[in-house]
Amino acid sequence: MIRLSILDQSLIGEGETAADTLQHTVKLAQMAEECGYHRFWVAEHHNNDEIAGSAPEVLLGYLAASTRKIRLASGGVMLQHYSSYKVAEQFHLLSALAPGRIDLGVGKAPGGFQLSTDALQAEYKKPVRQFDEKLEELTHFVRDDFPDTHRYAALRPRPQVDRKPGIFLLGGSTESAISAAKLGISFVFAYFINGEEEVLKEARRAFDAHLPPGSEAEFHLAPAVFAAHTKEEAEKHIVSRESIKVVLKDGRKVNVGSREQAEAYLENVTEPYDIIVQKTGIIAGTKEEVAEELTRLSGTYKINDFVIFTPIKNAVEKQLSYQLLSDAVLAAKR
């Protein structure tokens, strides 16, 4: 059975303030709960005039108080900027406030360009620790299972909770899928960034191949979805069918979105780089057409959980898209 969740970045609409947008996010979470969506994800972006969602760990607390039962998740915390212990404590606290409803999604990206990254990491020693090392440490903190000889074996995130947050890694590559699988944590493939089905196919295979025996970790897919009463109405929301990735000489990879955003990012880059153009995973059409494509992806890649990303700034049109999708896929569950 297909299960749907929502990823909301809190995109600021025409003529809106950031405060207006955040209230739209709250209302969208409430609608998602009523329509039968399983989980509501909120994102982290920095120094972006078009996005209000900069602190998911704060927004989740407000959403937990504004809803009753829907699961809530960060999509995701940009772990490279933070102490893994502090992140674990934040999500343990959220889990104490909303038991069984909180999940911790983390991302490898910076969530912004170099200026915001420099500000967020100003107190860090250089070079910053490798992401995989921090992710493994975070996983041990949340699970409370450091080896006895580890320097943090006696350190526990407070408050202690009976129902710990689930951990997810968000990414768009086979490499990230393998990193998640080896740790036995769930993986969300960012299809809305990398819509190459060959990459999806290989990431799915690699995730299964590297998962420890008995692990309950899952592989989720996050497509961009636009549903409307007609295919033409849905497709008017598509700004581009490609995304740009910048690969720096030191191995860092930054998804920058559009060509215009790539140009802005590269203004502050002094080292050699390569640019990779990726097809985005966009599904647009009537509710029946969208449901048909989700069913195809589910059957082809054995995926039951979809994280639906609908980057429409107009709150009414965005909500309509999610309502139509729920009518086509989730109505029988309500």
UniProtKB/Swiss-Prot annotation:
Keyword annotations for this protein?
Answer: Flavoprotein, FMN, Monooxygenase, Oxidoreductase
Which top-level enzyme class is recorded in the Swiss-Prot or TrEMBL entry? Answer: oxidoreductase
GO molecular function terms here? monooxygenase activity; oxidoreductase activity, acting on paired donors, with incorporation or reduction of molecular oxygen
**Lyase listed as a keyword:** no
Query: What Enzyme Commission number(s) appear in the record?
Result: 1.14.14.-
Coiled-coil regions, chain positions: none
Q: In which pathway does it act?
A: Amino-acid metabolism
Q: Which GO terms describe its cellular component?
A: cytosol
Q: Report if keyword Oxidoreductase is assigned.
A: yes
What's its catalytic activity? Answer: N-acetyl-S-benzyl-L-cysteine + FMNH2 + O2 = (R)-N-acetyl-S-benzyl-L-cysteine sulfoxide + FMN + H2O + H(+); N-acetyl-S-methyl-L-cysteine + FMNH2 + O2 = (R)-N-acetyl-S-methyl-L-cysteine sulfoxide + FMN + H2O + H(+)
Q: Do you know which InterPro entries this protein is assigned to?
A: Bact_Lucif_Oxidored (IPR050766), CmoO-like (IPR019949), Luciferase-like_dom (IPR011251), Luciferase-like_sf (IPR036661)
Disulphide-bridged cysteine pairs: none
Reported function: Involved in a cysteine salvage pathway from S-alkylcysteine. Catalyzes the oxidation of N-acetyl-S-benzyl-L-cysteine and N-acetyl-S-methyl-L-cysteine to (R)-N-acetyl-S-benzyl-L-cysteine sulfoxide and (R)-N-acetyl-S-methyl-L-cysteine sulfoxide, respectively. This pathway is likely important in the catabolism of alkylated cysteine generated by proteolysis of alkylated glutathione formed in the detoxification of a wide range of electrophiles.
The record's family statement is: To bacterial alkanal monooxygenase alpha and beta chains.
Protein name (record): N-acetyl-S-alkylcysteine monooxygenase
- Native organism is Bacillus subtilis (strain 168)
- Lineage, opening ranks: Bacteria, Bacillati, Bacillota, Bacilli, Bacillales
> Which gene codes for it?
cmoO
